[in-house]
Amino acid sequence: GLATSWDWDADTLTWTFHLREENWVDNNGEVVAPVTAQDFVDALKYVLTPDYASSNVGLVTAYVAGAEDYYNYYVYLNNANTGVVDDDGTTYTADASGVVTVTSADATAETYSPVDFDTVGVKAVDDHTLTYTLNFDFPGFLSLLSYAPYEPAYGPLLEEFADQFCTSAETACSCGAFYLAEYTPLENWVMKKNPENYDADSVYIDTVRYIYNQEE
């Protein structure tokens, strides 16, 4: 619902999305800031940051150009910095310039130079134009965008809360038909109608409450 139109360029394997004007709201339904293409970029960078342990990062690395190389480099760098040794004996070391050497148990070594996020195939062309460049022609990409790794997130909030982002209603922002008003982990969360949403007149439910089933 955040895009008004989109185009596919088969020659460059690039999807271009033209975004509508929409706002982020906080847990009280108050406007925080406009939604921009950069929010999609920031969110994807968050997903591709190993420190945040995204469980579905594979939905990005498999399809978005450069995403796998970027993610793997930072996995290897983290392993080097924390002294990880894999079960098969693989070790990781990093030099002062950030070049990581991955050495297998048979002493075979591969090196990986630092990877900049600019090499990942997601770009904010301007505030309302977003592009994704893929590894290959994948007709199902539009459906893939409904999955969590491709959702936008308010960049300044990601930066402020890091791994605590969206762990409470106070650390979240919403831009859909409903906003997160209350959240108690493993108990319940409450969504309320977002009056700022472009299609608010078509939403006839004011409050949705989810309650966890504590039974094992």
Where are these regions (language model features)?
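Short, polar/charged alpha-helical segment
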Residues: 1, 6, 191-192
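Conserved positions in beta-strands of structured domains
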Residues: 4-7, 123, 179-181
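Aromatic- and charge-enriched surface segment that lines or borders ligand/interaction sites
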Residues: 4-86, 92, 131
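Extracytoplasmic/periplasmic ligand-capture domains
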Residues: 20-52, 108-110, 177-216
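Short, surface-exposed, charged/polar-biased interaction segments
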Residues: 52, 56-68, 143, 153-155, ...
